[in-house]
Amino acid sequence: MTLWVGCDPGVVSGAIGALDDYGNYVESFDIEHKDKHILALVFKSRLLSIIDPKEGAEICLENVHSMPKQGVVSVWNFGRAVGVISAVCELTRYPVHLVTPQKWKKHFHLTADKSESLDMARYLWPEAKLKLKKDINKAEALLIAEYLRHTLHGIEKQKTA
């Protein structure tokens, strides 16, 4: 059974969400950092710990860009974080796919309002314990994983109750 992994990158707010072939919740976690630096080895170890090598995985990384009016330091820190996260995902040797926020959100009929993503993820995966507002990144990572599962795997395999 393939593990479907979604990644919402960020300097201090990156997260991973993972689902099984049927869209059932497997895991979600924040990507650890220290002083605005992603802890790459910790991230790689944690990511590989949820993937069964016999089963394999497909990883979907949100393809993000700097935002207008961000400062130079913010853009640099964000770009560095995205680069580290992307490199770690590539080094797992599992397929890595990119999707823009607009594309996966449109798939779920969501707007740019992050609270909509949190509400949808809470509804789809109540066992994920997305209780806090700060869990938005884990929620979006799970939705990115579900987007990948829908688009690559098809939606004939539905989430089990």
Please describe what each predicted stretch is.
Residues 1-161:
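Phosphate- and other anionic-substrate recognition elements at nucleic-acid/protein interfaces
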